[in-house]
Curated annotation (Swiss-Prot):
GO biological processes: nuclear protein quality control by the ubiquitin-proteasome system; proteasome localization; protein transport
Complexes and interactors: Binds the proteasome.
Region (Disordered): 1-85
Gene assigned in the entry: sts1
Protein name as annotated: Tethering factor for nuclear proteasome sts1
Gene3D superfamilies attached to this UniProt entry: Tethering factor for nuclear proteasome Cut8/Sts1 (1.20.58.1590)
Comp. bias regions, Polar residues: 14-32
Keyword annotations: Cytoplasm, Nucleus, Protein transport, Transport
Length: 310
């Protein structure tokens, strides 16, 4: 028997026409990424469910109330005048003063209401106003030369008149009967007299009449206040306030132009000294005083009325 042997060929060396299907790498990667995104979405959804289950643990989702006191901006903004309070905030003191004076001139009833309702000026505020006028007067002097020359006088004449006019206007406000407290009147006159002392003595005699007149008016004001102060509480304000020394000093600085005030003070202190000596003399002085009151018909005029028949 003739047997034919064929050579053995390994399978991997055979020409295999059946090939395994090729896989698309791009589609595989997209599918994997899709699964990954789906897993992430599922996880995020679970987190959202867990967060929504306890809203108190997430303060970001709570509504915040609008802070009080804040005004919402108007959506329909248009031009309009300022409210009166805002307008007054923009005015300077001079502008405010000019505005009030203009309104009062047109409406006298408003002027009277302002005078009656405005707070009374204090000594400090009034002296501060006078100090501003004095500073303006001093600043008007020219540089160089004598401060008492005619040229300097002509340069500061307007400021000098404004200062003296302010003294004339403010002084009556602190005199009785408008001012009932002697201490207040005396304190203002003390500061106002110092301002007159600081006025220069001009080279020309006629130019000094402003200062002379200011001294005369101030001396009369001192006399009025001293006379009224001597009537209240036995003149204790004059006795123990040291005003005798202050007025004597003012008279010395002015060159004797405050003599009227000095004489009034001497008369008041002399009367009070005589009353003190009479009260210390004892009963005879008291009896003589009663006799003089009986003869003049003034006995009991100053005593309080009694209650009852006797």
């Amino acid at each position: 028997m003739n047997v034919q042997y064929q050579a053995f060929t390994p399978p991997h060396l055979l020409n295999n026409t059946r090939r395994s299907p090729t896989r698309n790498i791009s589609s595989l990667s997209s599918a994997m990424s899709g699964r990954k995104r789906k897993a992430e979405d599922d996880g995020s959804a679970g987190d959202d469910d867990r967060m929504s289950a306890s809203p108190s643990a997430s303060p970001a989702v709570l509504p915040r109330p609008a802070p009080r006191g804040m005004k919402r901006m108007r959506t329909n903004i248009s031009g309009r005048p300022l409210p009166l309070p805002r307008l007054l905030e923009t005015l300077s003191p001079d502008e405010m003063r000019n505005l009030l004076q203009s309104i009062c001139q047109r409406h006298p009833d408003i002027s009277n209401e302002i005078v009656t309702t405005a707070p009374r000026p204090s000594i400090q505020s009034t002296l501060e106003v006078l100090a501003k006028y004095e500073a303006s007067f001093q600043a008007a002097f020219p540089f160089g030369g004598r401060a008492s020359s005619d040229y300097a006088y002509n340069r500061v004449r307007q400021q000098l008149d404004e200062l003296l006019d302010s003294l004339k206007d403010f002084t009556p406000h602190f005199l009785p009967p408008n001012e009932q407290q002697p201490a207040t009147s005396l304190a203002f006159l003390d500061g106002a007299t110092d301002i007159i002392h600081r006025l220069p003595n001009w080279d020309t005699f006629q130019h000094n009449r402003h200062k002379q007149e200011a001294y005369e008016e101030m001396a009369k004001a001192w006399a009025i206040v001293i006379r009224e102060a001597a009537k209240k509480a036995g003149g204790i304000q004059l006795q123990y306030g040291g005003w005798d020394e202050k007025i004597a000093k003012h008279n010395e600085i002015s060159g004797g132009k405050m003599q009227e005030a000095v004489n009034e003070l001497r008369g008041g202190l002399g009367w009070m000294g005589a009353e003190t000596s009479n009260s210390a003399a004892g009963a005879p002085a008291d009896a003589m005083s009663i006799r003089q009151q009986l003869l003049s018909g003034n006995y009991g005029a100053g005593s309080p009325a009694s209650i009852g028949a006797w």
